[in-house]
Amino acid sequence: MEKCCHYFNLMELILGERARRVFASGGQRVNHLDERYQGRTPDILDSAFVIVDYPSGARAMLDLCMFAENSVDNEQISIVGDAGKLESLLPSLTLRHSRRADWGQRAVWGQPSGTGRGVAVRRVWDTNIRYAGQHFGASYIEHQRFAQAVRDDGPAEIPLDEGLRCVAVGLAAHRSIETGLPALLADFLPAELL
């Protein structure tokens, strides 16, 4: 799950709080099964559901499938709350925002529950991205900003403690997959990073 740390960091950023507990189910189903290194098959997880609990009661979930790339949007982020839903879709660069204002207004059985009123759809992109490369340009931007911080002797955009917490979420997910039980972040981090 360490390969998903950037998603765990994004969850912290969006929620404005630190993960408390992780429950995960996953495994290796397709990728690298035919490879051998020193006589062993690599143990790279290629699919998982990871639920992350936060102190406020908020939850975030990662749905990882590294062998289902052939879809219109193989990366989707959804944020759902009592006011509505925000969806970011890649590589179509689509952002959708909808409100719950008209949900559940059925006049007759069989009619859709929503009318679509309040749904905004737009395409978004950063014109500074010269080469999309990995992660649809995000890696390019990360490298640019990191290089600038090094040149200016400035702070990294993501501080070390945030990075450590997100790696710990990945480790907790691995443990949860191995044991079938929730894992507490307190078992992976010192108290000052919780």
Positions of predicted regions on the chain:
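Rossmann-like dinucleotide-binding domain that binds NAD(P)(H)
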Residues: 1-74, 161
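C-terminal glycine/acidic-rich active-site capping loop/insertion
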Residues: 21, 31-41, 45, 49-54, ...
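Short, conserved clusters of charged catalytic residues that mark active-site
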Residues: 6, 155-158, 168
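Residues at helix-coil transition
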Residues: 16, 148-152, 178
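A general structural signal for well-ordered alpha-helical segments in protein cores
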Residues: 7-8, 143-144, 170
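Short arginine-rich
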Residues: 169-179
